[in-house]
């Protein structure tokens, strides 16, 4: 593993003012640097992992990662990456490694991780990321201030390509809110965002098979995270304390109070301080709900047929 410190990378202070904006900047820079590495890797002549330089590959969510961090106080940037040392048998090819570390990497870092050296297109991309993040946080604040559970914007693309991919499905039907649940939320950048509000309380999603019930619930489940542009779920946002709960046959449970759901067990076990190494479907789901409530969650998501 190789770590690189870039003192005073020079990114505008507004990108670092809030935690959400700083994380979005770090995420965008990591993606930008990853693309530059991918282009360079195509010209690599070595086989296997020899001579490769790799960084963490972000998914669709915008998350804080140790792969790239920026200090909000000093603006110093730290990049952590993995370098596959070029080798010949059991020997490291030091001359090739020197080329990678001292000739190839420095210009890539200078051109992609120092603000003054970015192209106009790269700077515009970072500004778009900043504006999207500000809009997302404004909607999250609206959800909190108005006792909502979640918000789903009109035009959102909820279906994914497959169960093994988190990419948006092409030609999917875009989400449209029912009129009686539609609201418009003012955001710092652009026109108000229209979509469906989900108030706090018990909300039941019903419909026929293949009508998107689980797809909507899955999108709400991921709504605790911000998503990148063109994901389709940029403005599908839920309370930050939302938790998905379900039955987990066979899970271990230790000293959970599930007496609100189950009081009398045939083996005379206490449900006030329930313990087992092999929970059934009902006791595991009861334990999951109890643990979610103990953690402070005010929004439970359950997919039950």
Over which residues does each language-model region extend?
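N-terminal accessory targeting/assembly segments
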Residues: 1-147, 158
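Helical mechanochemical/support elements of P-loop NTPase systems and associated helical scaffolds
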Residues: 21, 25, 97, 101, ...
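Short, ordered loop/turn segments at secondary-structure junctions
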Residues: 86, 156, 210-211, 248-250, ...
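Charged, amphipathic alpha-helical linker segments immediately N-terminal to NTP-binding catalytic cores
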Residues: 130-184
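Pre-Walker A adenine-sensing motif
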Residues: 181-197
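Glycine-rich phosphate-binding P-loop
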Residues: 193-225
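Flexible phosphate/Mg2+-sensing switch loops adjacent to catalytic phosphate-binding sites
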Residues: 226-240
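Switch/coupling sub-region of P-loop NTPases
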Residues: 238-305
């Amino acid at each position: 593993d190789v770590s690189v410190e870039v003192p005073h990378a020079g990114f505008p202070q507004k990108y670092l003012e809030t935690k959400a904006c700083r994380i979005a900047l770090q995420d965008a820079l990591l993606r930008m640097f990853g693309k530059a590495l991918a282009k360079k890797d195509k010209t690599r002549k070595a086989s296997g992992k020899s001579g490769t330089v790799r960084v963490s590959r972000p998914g669709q969510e915008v998350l804080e990662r140790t792969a790239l961090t920026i200090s909000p106080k000093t603006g110093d940037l730290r990049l952590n990456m993995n370098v596959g040392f070029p080798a010949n048998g059991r020997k490291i090819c030091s001359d090739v490694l020197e080329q990678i570390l001292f000739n190839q990497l420095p210009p890539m870092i200078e051109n992609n991780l120092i603000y003054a050296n970015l192209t106009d297109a790269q700077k515009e991309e970072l500004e778009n990321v900043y504006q999207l993040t500000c809009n997302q946080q404004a909607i999250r604040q609206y959800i909190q201030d108005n006792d909502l559970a979640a918000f789903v914007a009109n035009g959102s693309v909820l279906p994914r390509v497959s169960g093994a991919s988190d990419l948006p499905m092409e030609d999917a039907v875009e989400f449209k809110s029912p009129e009686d649940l539609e609201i418009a939320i003012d955001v710092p950048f652009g026109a108000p965002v229209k979509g469906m509000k989900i108030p706090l309380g018990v909300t039941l999603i019903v419909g026929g098979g293949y009508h998107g019930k689980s797809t909507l619930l899955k999108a709400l489940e991921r709504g605790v995270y911000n998503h990148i542009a063109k994901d389709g779920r940029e403005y599908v946002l839920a309370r930050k304390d939302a938790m998905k709960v379900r039955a987990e046959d066979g899970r271990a449970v230790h000293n959970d109070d599930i007496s609100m759901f189950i009081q009398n067990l045939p083996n005379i076990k206490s449900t006030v301080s329930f313990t087992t190494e092999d929970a059934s479907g009902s006791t595991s789901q009861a334990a999951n709900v109890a643990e979610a409530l103990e953690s402070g969650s005010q929004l439970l998501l359950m997919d039950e047929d």
